[in-house]
């Protein structure tokens, strides 16, 4: 696998970003640019990655195409289309978003409507519409799994891939987001193995993080955290990823704020990988 993440830290442009990239030791990164970034600046970021043999693994959308505000929803949809078009032009394999929600609580919030048949059909239409507008050849549009939003299981994701029925719709793996109940948490290694076994042919990018649940506090609270701060068995999980994914599969750390936090998490996983003969 190619272990990496988001390059964090203070930078004002590609030159300072490149310095952080080198220090990070990342082999794969999220795109530090978007469709709104001036092309000269985008090209400078890409050149920095090329100089150091780093793969730009994914470009994010992270906007709610089902926003209850029609203007915001339309803007989000146009951004998704633009990001996918940019990814395809630049050869970035994964353009990732979440399915969307009509909740007023937030762009990625839980809502009773998230699991209705009407919403499921709307997701299919939305994904098809985005892909059909762009007609990508190299990039894939993917949905990140969410604890309270489709897709929320490997079987659900497989069914969605079949129902969308577009060759450029693929999978973005976030197994911690799908560890959304005590059963999956307590059998996390087995569940992650199931995710990889079923979805590996479709996975274009993977997020890696940790999770924890207090064993006696009621009621259940599952808390995402950085690798090493939770209870996941990364020796076994890295082996699953190593055996189940291609050697050049990007595996990305996320949701940290500072360079130091990413550095610590990367070092933790790199140490485990080294102890177990796993190439990153």
Model-identified regions with their sequence ranges:
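Active-site acidic/histidine proton-transfer and metal-coordination neighborhood
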Residues: 50-51, 70-171
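Acidic/histidine-rich catalytic cores of soluble enzymes
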Residues: 19, 29, 59, 125-225, ...
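N-terminal pre-domain/capping segments
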Residues: 1-93, 117, 128, 166, ...
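Acidic-and-aromatic substrate-binding clefts and catalytic sites of carbohydrate-active enzymes
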Residues: 7-15, 31-44, 64-74, 103, ...
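Short, electropositive alpha-helical surface patch
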Residues: 111-119, 150-167, 222-237, 260-276
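A cross-domain feature marking catalytic cores of carbohydrate-active enzymes
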Residues: 5-9, 31-35, 58-63, 97-99, ...
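Aromatic/hydrophobic pocket-lining residues that form the small-molecule binding cavity
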Residues: 14-17, 42, 76-80, 120-123, ...
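A structural motif
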Residues: 26, 89-92, 138, 203, ...
């Amino acid at each position: 696998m190619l272990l990496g993440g988001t390059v964090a830290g203070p930078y004002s442009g590609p030159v300072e970003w490149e310095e952080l990239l080198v220090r990070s030791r990342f082999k794969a990164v999220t795109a530090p640019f978007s469709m709104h970034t001036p092309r000269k600046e985008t090209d400078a970021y890409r050149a920095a990655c090329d100089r150091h043999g780093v793969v730009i693994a994914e470009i994010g959308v992270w906007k709610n195409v089902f926003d209850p505000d029609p203007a915001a929803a339309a803007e989000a949809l146009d951004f998704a289309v633009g990001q996918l078009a940019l990814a395809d032009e630049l050869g970035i394999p994964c353009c990732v978003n979440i399915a969307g929600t009509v909740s007023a609580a937030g762009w990625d919030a839980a809502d009773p409507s998230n699991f209705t048949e009407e919403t499921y059909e709307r997701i299919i239409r939305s994904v098809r519409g985005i892909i059909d507008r762009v007609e990508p050849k190299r990039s894939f549009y993917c949905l990140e799994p969410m604890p309270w939003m489709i897709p929320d299981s490997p079987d659900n994701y497989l069914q969605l891939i079949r129902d969308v029925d577009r060759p450029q719709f693929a999978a973005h793996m976030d197994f911690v987001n799908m560890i959304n109940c005590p059963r999956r948490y307590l059998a996390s290694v087995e569940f992650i193995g199931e995710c990889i076994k079923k979805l590996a042919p479709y996975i274009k990018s993977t997020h890696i993080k940790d999770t924890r649940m207090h064993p006696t506090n009621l009621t259940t609270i599952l808390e995402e955290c950085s690798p090493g701060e939770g209870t996941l068995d990364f020796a076994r999980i890295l082996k699953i990823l190593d055996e189940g994914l291609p050697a050049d599969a990007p595996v990305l750390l996320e949701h940290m704020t500072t360079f130091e936090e990413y550095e610590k998490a990367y070092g933790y996983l790199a140490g485990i990988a080294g102890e177990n003969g796993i190439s990153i």
